[in-house]
């Protein structure tokens, strides 16, 4: 039975085959969940991100790349770049949807069974939380139904507001 689990806590401590990183386009680490994943995972993640940068020049908004997970309780880190919120008239919704879809393409390609997502773009990028949660759940429900190997999607919420929002939207 495929399931969606909502967790409040630190994504770097949640065991899953893949952890999604809300990265920036440089792939060099940053603040929020991105910084936490790089710190907890260790230098191997940054080294792999630098190889990707050298090959393709970073990661565009809406795209995703995959690396090993270093010291994290996972096999992979999927780095995706969500959009910065400006006013909702610059394709932010479509770009956030594409960021989640890009992650699921990598999940499918690598036969991943369990993946943990943070709340992409809702921190410093300022995406309205309920709007982001609705987009995330629409994509997740569609992809979990289509994917042959995926069994569990963890939504790991750093704050109580996102946690409560996801619980409300799922019920």
UniProtKB/Swiss-Prot annotation:
Keyword Hydrolase: yes
Ranges where the Macro domain occurs: 1-171
Disulfide bonds: none
GO terms of biological process kind: purine nucleoside metabolic process
Domain of life: Bacteria
Residues noted as binding substrate in the record, renumbered to the chain: 10-11, 24, 32-34, 121-125
Gene Ontology molecular function: O-acetyl-ADP-ribose deacetylase activity; purine nucleoside binding; ribonuclease inhibitor activity
Keywords: Hydrolase
Active site, per annotation: 34
Keyword Ribosomal protein: no
SMART domains (UniProt xref): A1pp
Enzyme class at the top of the EC tree: hydrolase
EC number: 3.1.1.106
SUPFAM superfamilies given in the database record: Macro domain-like
Reaction equation(s) it catalyzes: 3''-O-acetyl-ADP-D-ribose + H2O = ADP-D-ribose + acetate + H(+); 2''-O-acetyl-ADP-D-ribose + H2O = ADP-D-ribose + acetate + H(+)
Quaternary structure note: Homodimer. Interacts with RNase III.
Summary of the function given for this chain in its UniProt record: Deacetylates O-acetyl-ADP ribose to yield ADP-ribose and free acetate. Down-regulates ribonuclease 3 (RNase III) activity. Acts by interacting directly with the region of the ribonuclease that is required for dimerization/activation.
Family as reported in the entry's similarity comment: Belongs to the MacroD-type family. YmdB subfamily.
PANTHER family found in the cross-reference section: GANGLIOSIDE INDUCED DIFFERENTIATION ASSOCIATED PROTEIN 2-RELATED (PTHR11106), MACRO DOMAIN-CONTAINING PROTEIN (PTHR11106:SF27)
HAMAP family assigned: YmdB
Protein name stated in the entry: O-acetyl-ADP-ribose deacetylase 1
Source species of the chain: Pantoea vagans (strain C9-1) (Pantoea agglomerans (strain C9-1))
């Amino acid at each position: 039975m495929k399931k969606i689990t909502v967790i409040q806590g630190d994504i770097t401590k949640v065991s899953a085959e893949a952890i999604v990183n809300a990265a920036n386009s440089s792939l060099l680490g940053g603040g929020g969940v991105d910084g936490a994943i790089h710190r907890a995972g260790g230098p191997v993640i940054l080294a792999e991100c630098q190889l990707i940068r050298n090959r393709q020049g970073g990661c565009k908004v809406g795209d995703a790349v995959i690396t090993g997970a270093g010291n994290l309780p996972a096999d992979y880190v999927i780095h995706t770049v969500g959009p910065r919120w400006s006013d909702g008239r610059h394709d932010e919704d479509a770009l956030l949807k594409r960021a989640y879809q890009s992650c699921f393409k990598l999940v499918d390609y690598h036969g991943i069974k369990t993946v943990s997502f943070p709340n992409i773009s809702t921190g410093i990028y300022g995406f309205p939380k309920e709007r982001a949660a609705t987009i995330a759940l629409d994509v997740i429900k569609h992809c979990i139904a289509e994917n042959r190997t995926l069994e569990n999607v963890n939504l790991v919420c750093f704050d109580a507001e996102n946690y409560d929002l996801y619980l409300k939207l799922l019920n």
